[in-house]
């Protein structure tokens, strides 16, 4: 029987030649089980309402513009997936540094108190297409401040300097 949904730990390997599923029961358990939905619905709706605040929107835009301009100005960094003209609209940045392994960079950033996603992002064929073994993904949320954005960029610069 073939799973009707995909994602998360239910897949062992994805390639152009096919997909290998995890053994049972994981094969049919795509993603994380959503047992927190009911008690978290009210706070989620409150956060959505809060995100309409013009000051918060301005702060998000400022953070995103700063992070994008800082990453794109660094010749050591290769950014993926940010179409031209949308720089201030995204808050998720996928990137790699030529000559630096993504896991090494993620470990150093972790020691600096920065959480990033490292790996193939469940997209092995895309990594092959880009000619990379993996990348990092940094995400920013409405609660992130300019101070945190500056700390991320300065820490990333320091971590790259340690590895190059």
Put a short name on every predicted segment.
Residues 1-164:
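Pyridoxal 5′-phosphate
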């Amino acid at each position: 029987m073939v799973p009707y949904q995909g994602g998360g730990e239910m897949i062992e390997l994805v390639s152009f030649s096919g997909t290998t599923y995890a053994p049972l029961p994981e094969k049919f358990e795509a993603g994380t089980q959503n047992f927190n939905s009911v008690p978290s619905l009210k706070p989620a709706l409150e956060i959505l309402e809060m995100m309409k605040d013009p000051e918060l929107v301005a702060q998000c835009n400022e953070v995103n513009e700063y992070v994008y301009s800082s990453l794109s100005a660094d010749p050591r960094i290769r950014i993926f997936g940010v179409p031209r003209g949308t720089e201030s609209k995204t808050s998720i940045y996928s990137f790699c540094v030529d000559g630096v392994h993504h896991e090494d960079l993620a470990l150093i950033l972790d020691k600096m108190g920065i959480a990033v996603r490292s790996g193939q992002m469940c997209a092995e064929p895309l990594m092959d297409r880009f000619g990379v073994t993996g990348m990092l993904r940094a995400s920013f949320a409405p609660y992130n401040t300019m101070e945190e954005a500056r700390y991320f960029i300065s820490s990333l610069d320091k971590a790259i300097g340690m590895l190059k």
